[in-house]
């Protein structure tokens, strides 16, 4: 039995959830999200208590695996439309910087050319300083995926720590060569 799947999802005041078959619609102050649940996952909404419960219709490995996943994805949708998701990245290194050109993100990361990244339409990117980037949006997966794409342009290296890292990420440092003396 999934410990995560058994838990209910509490619905905030300004968020509405409705079902049409296996399709779940979540509306909130930040926007709207839709997801199709697997056919063997049953969703029930308790309106007076403002809670959502998920149940398995079958007992097999696939339904067991997708039971907790479906609950977490639904919970992430509720959080996304109520408060949104954001991920911060920091840039370390001499001459490394970021800037916005319209909705496009331009990264100068020590290559012979600036790296231009087109922001997906569902996300917003802000550059607070040339060394700080924030990716925000409604869907947690989309925010994390685009932040990972930005980080992959120049991941932090272990010797000097130069590159793009998530805020709060711990970079394991290595000692350099000692050389002959």
From Swiss-Prot:
Molecular-function GO terms, alphabetical: rRNA binding; structural constituent of ribosome
Residues passing through the membrane, by range: none
Record key words, sorted: Chloroplast, Plastid, Ribonucleoprotein, Ribosomal protein, RNA-binding, rRNA-binding
Extent of the signal sequence: none
InterPro entries (alphabetical): Ribosomal_uL6-like, Ribosomal_uL6-like_a/b-dom_sf, Ribosomal_uL6_a/b-dom, Ribosomal_uL6_bac-type, Ribosomal_uL6_CS
Alphabetized SUPFAM superfamilies for the sequence: Ribosomal protein L6
A GO-annotated cellular component: cytosolic large ribosomal subunit
Subcellular location: Plastid, Chloroplast
Family matches, as NCBIfam families: L6_bact
Record's function text: Binds 23S rRNA.
Family as reported in the entry's similarity comment: Belongs to the universal ribosomal protein uL6 family.
Subunit organization: Part of the 50S ribosomal subunit.
Matches recorded under PANTHER family: 60S/50S RIBOSOMAL PROTEIN L6/L9, LARGE RIBOSOMAL SUBUNIT PROTEIN UL6M
The protein's name in its UniProt record: Large ribosomal subunit protein uL6c
Organism: Emiliania huxleyi
Upper classification of the organism: Eukaryota, Haptista, Haptophyta, Prymnesiophyceae, Isochrysidales
């Amino acid at each position: 039995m999934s410990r995560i799947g058994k838990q209910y999802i509490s619905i905030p005041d300004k968020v509405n959830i409705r079902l049409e078959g296996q399709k779940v619609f979540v509306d909130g102050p930040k926007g709207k999200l839709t997801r199709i649940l697997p056919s063997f996952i049953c969703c029930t909404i308790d309106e007076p208590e403002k809670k959502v419960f998920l149940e398995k219709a079958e007992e097999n490995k696939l339904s067991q695996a997708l039971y907790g996943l479906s609950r977490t994805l639904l919970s992430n949708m509720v959080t996304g439309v109520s408060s949104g998701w954001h991920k911060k990245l920091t840039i370390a290194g001499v001459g490394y910087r970021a800037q916005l050109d319209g909705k496009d993100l331009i990264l100068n990361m020590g290559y012979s050319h600036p790296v231009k990244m087109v922001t997906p339409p569902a996300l917003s990117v802000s550059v607070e300083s040339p060394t700080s980037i924030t990716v925000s949006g409604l869907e947690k997966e989309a925010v994390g995926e685009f932040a990972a794409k930005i980080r992959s342009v120049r991941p932090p290296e272990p010797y000097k720590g130069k590159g793009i890292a998530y805020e709060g990420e711990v970079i394991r440092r290595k000692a350099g060569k000692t050389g002959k003396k």
